[in-house]
Amino acid sequence: MRGLFLCSLMPLPYRPQPGEILICSFDDVACGAEMIKRRPVVVVSCHQSHRRNLCTVVPLSTTAPTPVMAWHHPLPHLSVTGWKASAPMWAKCDMLATVSFVRLNQPYLKSRSGGRRFVPHALLAGDLAAIRKCIQIYLIM
């Protein structure tokens, strides 16, 4: 496998499950300190009742927060295809966002022949519970 590609223009063709790690394109428009660029996210909620192909995600980053607060959760054991393997991941629960499936895709590898191999990722149940707790802390502060 030669090149590494992280996101395509095709929307996610299924309803993602909480704990699933996807790639989100925040490229379109950002104001002020809003999230930008393509980055991994963890799905924290995706209700059938939305019926608008929306889900709520928490962005992941290899940049450690300064200072580390109660709403940041370290994920040192997590490695997402295409991201720096040596840098530990952080869940930035203060950057919670509801996004369209159009912004989401699974990470994938691209072969020399042009094919794609999607690489599914999911958090451990304990990490998802910790991230949800961090969201609660942030929202009630």
Where are each of the predicted segments found?
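Short, structured beta-strand/loop micro-motifs enriched in basic residues and often containing a Trp
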Residues: 1-6
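Compact nucleic-acid interaction/catalytic patches
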Residues: 30-38, 43-81
